[in-house]
Amino acid sequence: MLKSMSALAATLAISAACLTLLPGGKRAEAQSAGMFVNAVDLDIVPAEREKYLAAIKENGAAAAKEPGCRRFDILNLGSDPNHFFLYEVYDSEAAFKAHRETDHFKKYMAITGKMVAKRESRQMSVIAANAK
């Protein structure tokens, strides 16, 4: 639990700084409120790590191209090569739900089902994003 909570806290702190930036480095503080975040903590079966990485990179790249997806970050806990954290930001909960209906998401879930030893996800609404 501590590992997942510390990963969550670190990721949220790092990502909050990036959340308010639009392409070209323009700030979007007013647009950040109301956005929707999906944060996922994952422990991967060690023997499946490389296959998992290929699958999540493919899914993340496709997700980032979806209308309504602001970012899709794939992070690895440095002290544990098999512990990953996904940080996904969408314009709305509806955009997140649309993501879960895409062919690439369904493919990712089908391929990685047995690769994941533990999955814990949280959905959150952005109240405010503060960054310099």
Question: Which role fits each region the language model picked out?
Answer:
Residues 35-43, 73-100:
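Short, well-ordered beta-strand segments in beta-rich or mixed alpha/beta enzyme
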Residues 31, 99-106:
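Residues at secondary-structure transition points
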Residues 55, 75, 99-102, 111:
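Residue-level signal for well-ordered alpha-helical positions
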Residues 28-37, 41-53, 90-93, 127-129:
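N-proximal accessory regions
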Residues 48-70, 104-108:
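Short amphipathic alpha-helical segments
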Residues 4-34, 74-80, 109-132:
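Glycine-rich beta-strand-turn "strand-cap" elements at beta-sheet edges
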